[in-house]
Amino acid sequence: MYLQLQKVRGNKFLATGPTNFQAWSIARFIEQVAAAGKAEYPLPLYINVALRDPLTNPMATHYESGGATDNVIPIWKVAAPSIDLLAPDIYLSGSERILKVIDLYTRADNTLFVPEAGLIADNAKYFYDVLAHGGIGFSPFGIDDNGDSSNDEHLAERLAPFAQEYAMAAPMMREMAQWVFDDKIKAVVEHEDGAEQSIKLGAWDAIIKFGSGRGGELKPNKDHNGKAMIVSLDENKFIMAGTNCRITFRPTGSNAGKAWQYLKVEEGWYENGVFKSLRILNGDETDWGGPAIGDKPRVLQISLVVR
């Protein structure tokens, strides 16, 4: 019956009716359970979503239809109001596909929360993008498992990219929460083609190139795991974090085309709401294509000036 309806031309309801009906039915059942639970113990509730491919609009026979997939989010929001968050489990592959999921589940009525993601090194690069979308959690599956002691080395290798990001973020979690609330965080992740990307920052554009090395051409990232996050503190001052990337800037607006320079670039961390400078990067570390960050995340405070 469903396959026959898919062949109907010119009638969107007939083509999507079974999918929508399935979503409505399951969501209404979940709503009864959730509402009863909240009546006894009013905790916030979320559901894990087994995703469909957000780029290809696959037939319902090719994914777990009935769940809160991107095509039926509005139905779930109406049918299951006791569910506070529709939370995507990210087990898809490909940066374009995953970034699309992050966009689709960031809504005025749905704060982004990633309760599961594959415990693979590549997924660590999406941590910044989740933050930039106002996300309140990013939890790779099994990250809290001690694992098999006979395979500790392999487990440590898989956990390291996530552990390093969380260690970097931990001292400035309160600042990050405020930056997210104020919509000050911008992020990019490296795509499979390794192409450079840019971020608009008001009076400046930030240009991020991915790879390793300082000066000249960067050595491409084998695993395409580069990423960068930039926070606007004021018009000419920024916090940056990232891995396997290099950043430079370009003035825009009335200053477009003018000469500019780094006034100061400091590496450091936040402590009790204050940036603590560990060291000031010298000219050789900033002038040859901009500050570069290797395979371990660092936090930089960057001040710029137009000459």
What residue ranges belong to the model's regions?
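Polysaccharide-binding and catalytic clefts of secreted carbohydrate-active enzymes
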Residues: 1-73
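A generic short-segment signal for beta-strand/edge and adjacent turn/coil regions
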Residues: 14-16, 54-57, 83, 109, ...
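Short linear motifs at secondary-structure transitions and domain/linker junctions
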Residues: 21-23, 59-64, 88-90, 202-207, ...
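Short amphipathic alpha-helical surface micro-motifs
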Residues: 27-28, 67-69, 119-122, 220-223
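Catalytic-core region of carbohydrate-active enzymes that cleave or remodel glycosidic bonds
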Residues: 34-39, 72-171
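Aromatic- and carboxylate-lined catalytic core of secreted/periplasmic carbohydrate-active enzymes
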Residues: 128-253, 268
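C-terminal beta-sandwich/jelly-roll accessory domains of carbohydrate-active enzymes
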Residues: 215-223, 236-307
